[in-house]
UniProtKB/Swiss-Prot annotation:
Pathway in which the depicted protein is active: Carbohydrate degradation; glycolysis; pyruvate from D-glyceraldehyde 3-phosphate: step 4/5
Protein name: Enolase
Catalysed reaction equations from the record: (2R)-2-phosphoglycerate = phosphoenolpyruvate + H2O
Keywords of the record: Cytoplasm, Glycolysis, Lyase, Magnesium, Metal-binding, Secreted
GO molecular function, one term: magnesium ion binding
Species: Lactobacillus delbrueckii subsp. bulgaricus (strain ATCC 11842 / DSM 20081 / BCRC 10696 / JCM 1002 / NBRC 13953 / NCIMB 11778 / NCTC 12712 / WDCM 00102 / Lb 14)
């Protein structure tokens, strides 16, 4: 039998859910199989993320990605022609070495990641397996999903500084049953907001973006929506927040400028404690401190780790080295996993491996600038990721991930069930 190799790698410039250019890559194998992947991009980005190569200049507001596209079509294509598509680590290593920079700044993480993902898709097709099975083998589970239903911070033009208010099902059940609870709560939330006189326009991730005065008001609306949908807050549906505290951290004075208050690290913890006391169904907080405020993050972790999932995003940027540093320092107890923060499938898997080794939960994540690509849905199942956040049950680029999970659950049958945080009987 003739050995299957990579025959061609081709990229093009497409557009994401915010109308910004992004990279699409197609990897064609010698047997004619084609794998395609589309690269997302974030609005709220960490300082240590791999470099998303943009063109600059006047075209498309400087956001064009033709430099990254050309890097795929020339340097990366030349490097990978004839390579083994089934050896993902070797493919990714070759691109990392070809780039030669610590942050993928020469070729662009968007160029490298698109190729990395498309290679995995092509390899799965060539072996006649679903992507989740190719990447994960037989060790699979459906993820617990977190849905951003009220948007603030960088994701919406309103008065709320905390970036995301999410709802998540917390009773062990099928994915479909849990998702239906989320959909019911989402539609009820719209009614609650309308009755209170708020606009119900949508933010980048499909959640509502009401012009509320503070985060407490947003949490009250969520609590009411959960109850009015017929569920018990904390027992059926819980709440999670992505604070994205770097958004309201002032580097000049080292204080947090949050909803009209100027707070130091201890005062910020007191602010969060007030919310946690009022809303016991709040079970998870992401980036509660700035990515450079190690002292604040560590202190908050030590005092809250038994009560709360503390998710590290900007603090680690899906980077194995930064994660190991955070673990050593005692920061957080969960890792947010974004493929485009680090730039290859292999490095992302390594970050997940390190997280699991040290008892950290993992939450696979979309970006605010998304496409219809469903790679992360398969990836969450394949990696036993436990958790996945990919927006509200609205906007096709978000819902398509959930529809893919419905298909996967149907294929897996009744054997695989959600593994919830916190564990529920």
């Amino acid at each position: 039998m003739t050995k299957v190799v990579i025959e061609n790698v081709h990229a093009r410039e497409i557009f994401d859910s915010r109308g910004n250019p992004t990279v699409e890559v197609e990897v064609t194998l010698s047997n004619g199989v084609v794998g395609r992947a589309e690269v997302p991009s974030g609005a709220s980005t960490g300082e240590n993320e791999a470099v998303e190569l943009r063109d600059g200049g006047s075209r498309l507001g400087g956001k064009g990605v033709m430099k990254a596209v050309n890097n795929v079509n020339t340097a990366i294509n030349n490097e990978l022609q004839g390579a083994d598509p089934f050896n993902q680590p070797a493919i990714d290593k070759a691109m990392i070495e070809l780039d030669g920079t610590p942050n993928k700044g020469k070729l662009g993480a968007n160029a490298i990641l698109g190729t990395s993902m498309a290679t995995a898709v092509a390899a799965a097709k060539a072996t006649h397996q679903p992507l989740y099975r190719y990447l994960g083998g037989t060790d699979l589970s459906m993820p617990q999903t977190f849905h951003n239903v009220i948007n603030g911070g960088e994701h919406a033009d309103n008065g709320i500084d905390i970036q995301e208010f999410m709802i998540t099902p917390v009773k062990k059940t099928s994915f479909r049953d849990g998702f239906e609870k989320i959909v019911n709560t989402y539609h009820t939330l719209k009614k609650v907001l309308e009755e209170k006189g708020y606009e119900t326009g949508l933010g980048d991730e499909g959640g509502f973006a009401p012009n509320m005065k503070d985060s407490e008001e947003a949490l009250k609306a969520l609590h009411e929506a959960i109850e009015r949908a017929g569920y018990v807050p904390g027992e059926d549906i819980a709440i999670a927040c992505d604070c994205a505290a770097s958004y309201y951290y002032n580097k000049e004075d080292g204080k947090y400028h949050l909803e009209g208050k100027v707070l130091d690290g201890d005062q910020l913890a007191e602010y969060y404690d007030k919310l946690l006391a009022e809303f016991p169904e709040l079970i998870s907080m992401e980036d509660p401190y700035d990515e450079n405020d190690t002292e604040g993050m560590v202190k908050f972790t030590q005092s809250h780790k038994d009560r709360l999932q503390i998710v590290l995003d900007d603090f680690i940027c899906t980077n194995p080295r930064l994660l190991e540093k955070a673990i050593k320092e005692g920061a957080g107890n969960a890792s947010l996993i974004k493929l485009n923060q680090i730039g290859t499938v292999t490095e992302t898997l390594e970050t997940i491996r390190i997280s699991r080794k040290h008892g950290y939960n993992t939450m696979i994540s979309h970006r605010s600038g998304e496409t219809g690509d469903t790679f992360i849905a398969d990836f969450a199942v394949a990696t036993n990721g436990g958790q996945l956040k990919t927006g509200a049950p609205a906007r096709s680029e978000r819902v398509e991930k959930y529809n893919q999970l419905l298909r996967i659950e149907e294929q897996l049958g009744d054997g695989e069930r959600l593994d919830f945080f916190p564990a529920q009987d």
